[in-house]
Amino acid sequence: MGRGYRLVLVTDRRGSAYSGLLGDLETYRISAAGISGRGLTARISAVFQLGLGWLQARRLLKQLRPRAVAGFGGYPSVPTVVAASQLHCNTIIHEQNAVLGRANRMLAPYAARIATSFDRTDMLRDRDQARAVHTGNPVRPEIIEAATPYRMPEGDDPIEILVTGGSQGAAIFNEIIPPALASLPDALRGRLRVTQQCRGDGLALVQAVYREAGIQAELAPFFSDIPARLARAHLVIGRSGASTVAELAAMGRPAIMIPYPHATDNHQRENAARLCDAGGGWLIPQEDATSEALSALIRSVLESPDKAGRAAECARRVGVTDAAERLADLVCELIGDNAHMKQEQPKEITA
């Protein structure tokens, strides 16, 4: 929109429920369904839905005549990107994770460009590597605006710990993190200020553990001001979804990551590994994440300010704060608009 293009969102029924989060965006709905991990009858139905979506997408694309179509993963993007390629429209796909998702693996042969969030993406075939461009994963503007230089607290200053676990918190975090923090030495424990995303059904028990340990803690299923809390954090403990890793790197905050073990193709572990291999944090597989192991790691980080500071700097170095601009540039380059001239007629579609 900022470059003068008309943007259109093409998604399925589930995605259309979130279209309002993208502002006043023209939205079209097509049929789509996932295939993987389903029974035979469900797979047959999914293939039918994808075929119907392809017909709907072809009809829509002929009507809109877009200059470019961009797919952001998930099965709803499959019919539109395939139809666009067959209609000789410029196509691009973007992969958020360090492992190419199943939908994007299907779409890679149809894409003129493959935008990646990491400098290395697993399951990207050799023949597709030449079309891959590292753009990074766009983060919310609020993250960039809230970013401040990292400073580890000194003396008796409070230590801010931010615990996140996905949209509703991770149940296992309620079990292992409070006792891990409670078992820290008195000198550290008394300085802790914990903010923890905590499922409502376990909130009272978690609060009781913190209260008994004398730890100041703010608990809630959801925090609307995560960018500000992330900026204040001296250490983050959380999962390693694509957005979480991108925001940690863009903000430059050290993190202990416990990947969700059931993520498709174990992509959360690979996301965390990319950041940790660069020195930006520490990875603990969930099967190894006992309270004792976690407490020992937290203590080693908090008692060695230089260690946390180095991790913050390493995270910041791999962070891509202009990923949205890079992605927009890639689309403009693809359609031949190198000067990013504002025009009324050309259109981009986000599938």
Named regions from a protein language model:
Residues 87, 231-233, 249-258, 278:
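Conserved donor-binding/catalytic loop of nucleotide-activated donor transferases
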Residues 66-68, 231-246, 253-254:
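Acidic donor-binding loop of glycosyltransferase active sites
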Residues 14-18, 66-87:
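An aromatic- and histidine-rich active-site surface loop
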Residues 320-351:
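C-terminal alpha-helical cap of glycosyltransferases
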Residues 1, 10, 14-17, 22-25, ...:
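Donor-nucleotide binding loops and adjacent catalytic segments primarily
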Residues 6, 14-16, 85-148:
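Active-site-proximal region of nucleotide-activated glycan assembly enzymes
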Residues 307-321:
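A short, well-ordered alpha-helix in the C-terminal region of glycosyltransferases
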Residues 39-68:
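An amphipathic, basic-hydrophobic alpha-helix
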